[in-house]
Curated annotation (Swiss-Prot):
InterPro entries with a match to the protein in the record: AAA+_ATPase, ATP-dep_Clp_protease_ClpX, ATPase_AAA_core, Clp_ATPase_C, HslU, P-loop_NTPase
Pfam families from the UniProt entry: AAA, AAA_2
Residues annotated as binding ATP: I18, G60, V61, G62, K63, T64, E65, D256, E321, R393
Record's signal peptide: none
SUPFAM superfamilies noted in UniProt: P-loop containing nucleoside triphosphate hydrolases (SSF52540)
Record text on subunit structure and interactions: A double ring-shaped homohexamer of HslV is capped on each side by a ring-shaped HslU homohexamer. The assembly of the HslU/HslV complex is dependent on binding of ATP.
Family note: Belongs to the ClpX chaperone family. HslU subfamily.
Organism: Buchnera aphidicola subsp. Acyrthosiphon pisum (strain 5A)
GO MF assignments: ATP binding; ATP hydrolysis activity; peptidase activity; proteasome-activating activity
One GO-annotated biological process of the protein: proteolysis involved in protein catabolic process
Name listed for the protein in its UniProt record: ATP-dependent protease ATPase subunit HslU
SMART domains: AAA (SM00382), ClpB_D2-small (SM01086)
Subcellular location: Cytoplasm
Length: 443
């Protein structure tokens, strides 16, 4: 679990997301409260439940990006799902319980990687010795015992040095490794993924594990042997137990596009992919027990963060019970020209930095001037206002059009520096932004 304080979390999010201070503060406090809760005694800890969050704001303002970055910051099981992928229990499609199953799978993977990294040095030593056993020749029979030992020690040291330096990477050797029986591919009908996964595991385990001899390059042999030896040092039952505990105590679920499952006023009949999904989400958010292939998982203390644009609906269109279980509501603001300008230059790995790096691979150097950046931001904002506001995503469309000629002729401009100033932007974008037919900019 991350031990970062709210200001530290906000500072990290600031590196990638411009503005939206309220949303950043809300998620940073929620993340810190996960750590605070774990410091309490067991009785009080059980009573403290997470305060779930609903993020409201137009498309392209950073809701999904906050989730992506939060996943990296939170050293906890995390999963992002689209609300539109689910249908009500009893109908064809994914059931909401699969959210918890997927979260548990993510936790298993996370804990497994942690355990592998913990044993990394030991595994590397074992693999190195196995490779050396194959590489080092047996001493001649007519040698004395001391000659054998001395020669063997020198040879091992020589090969060990070459192995560590990567000199022998391309050399082929024959090794014995575990081979698993080929699994049977099963086409899963919607909503039956859990059953098909169990059937595939069953078929894979029927043949057991056998050793087989394979001739491989040393670099490939190291990869396979590392996986094999790492698996031997891992206790699967302990990993399952630890993963389920991590999910129950620190799990975070981000539900995107929740506005798309609001019931429409003019609809009639059973609403299996809208209100039905909301009803199925209720027990998960409130707290229930879900059966997974790794064991039973309680959802009482899992943090749920939902987000939606709510362009054709409002949060009050959600069923009242679900509204009550998302007590913290944060509104994200539409982006301005100044925000666009910052998005183009300030974040780590900004869009302009990405284009510059891509062109440098062909020996073309791009220089964006301050005036040029401002003009790009104004062009994107103008198109958003004229057609449909899709937020920061519009910058990708505008920049792609702006860089089209440079990208196409990059090989002919090797060694040149191209300055993208206000004149260049006006020449390539003004005609398009002033044109009434802006359909080409709609994503």
């Amino acid at each position: 679990m991350s031990e970062m304080t709210p200001p530290q979390i906000v500072s990290e999010l600031d590196k990638f997301i411009i503005g939206q201070e309220k949303a950043k503060r809300a998620v940073s406090i929620a993340l810190r409260n996960r750590w605070r809760r774990m410091q309490l005694n067991s009785e009080l800890r059980y009573e403290v439940t997470p305060k779930n969050i609903l993020m409201i704001g137009p498309t392209g303002v950073g809701k999904t990006e906050i989730a992506r970055r939060l996943a990296k910051l939170a050293d906890s099981p995390f999963i992002k799902v689209e609300a539109t992928k689910f249908t009500e229990v009893g109908y064809v499609g994914k059931e909401v319980d699969s959210i918890i199953r997927d979260l548990t799978d993510a936790a298993i993977k996370m804990i497994r990687i942690k355990n592998i990294n913990k044993n990394k040095v030991r595994v590397e030593e074992i693999v190195e010795e196995k490779i050396l056993d194959v590489l080092v020749p047996t001493p001649k029979k007519n040698w004395t015992e001391s000659e054998k030992n001395e020669s063997l020690a020198k040879t091992i040291q020589t090969f060990r040095k070459k192995l560590r330096e990567g000199v022998l990477d391309e050399k082929e050797i024959e090794i014995n490794i575990l081979s698993t029986t080929m699994g049977v591919e099963i086409m899963a009908p919607p909503g039956m993924e859990e059953l098909t996964n169990q059937l595939q595991s069953l078929f894979q385990n029927l043949g057991g594990h056998k050793k087989s001899s394979r001739r491989l390059k040393i670099k490939d042999a190291i990869v396979l042997l590392t996986e094999e030896e790492a698996a031997k040092l891992i206790n699967q039952e302990e990993i399952k137990k630890e993963a389920i505990n991590a999910v129950e105590q620190n799990g975070i679920v981000f539900i995107d596009e929740i506005d798309k499952i609001c019931r429409r006023g003019d609809s009639s009949g059973p609403d299996i992919s809208r209100e039905g999904v909301q009803r199925d989400l209720l027990p998960l958010v409130e707290g229930c027990t879900v059966s997974t292939k790794h064991g039973m998982v309680k959802t009482d203390h899992i943090l749920f963060i939902a987000s939606g644009a709510f362009q054709t609906s409002t949060p009050s269109d959600l069923i009242p019970e679900l509204q009550g279980r998302l007590p913290i509501k944060v509104e994200l603001q539409a982006l301005t020209i100044d925000d666009f300008e910052k998005i183009l230059t300030e974040p780590t790995a900004s869009i302009t930095a990405q284009y510059k790096a891509l062109m440098e691979t062909e020996g073309v150097y791009i220089n964006f001037t301050k005036e040029g950046i401002r003009n790009i931001a104004e062009a994107a904002w103008k198109v958003n206002e004229s057609i449909e506001n899709i937020g920061a995503r519009r910058l990708h469309t505008v920049l792609e059009k702006l860089m089209e000629d440079i990208s196409f002729n990059a090989s002919d401009n090797k060694g040149n520096t191209i300055e993208i100033n206000s004149n260049y932007v006006e020449e390539h974008l003004d005609q398009l932004t002033s044109n009434e037919d802006l359909g080409r900019f709609i994503l």
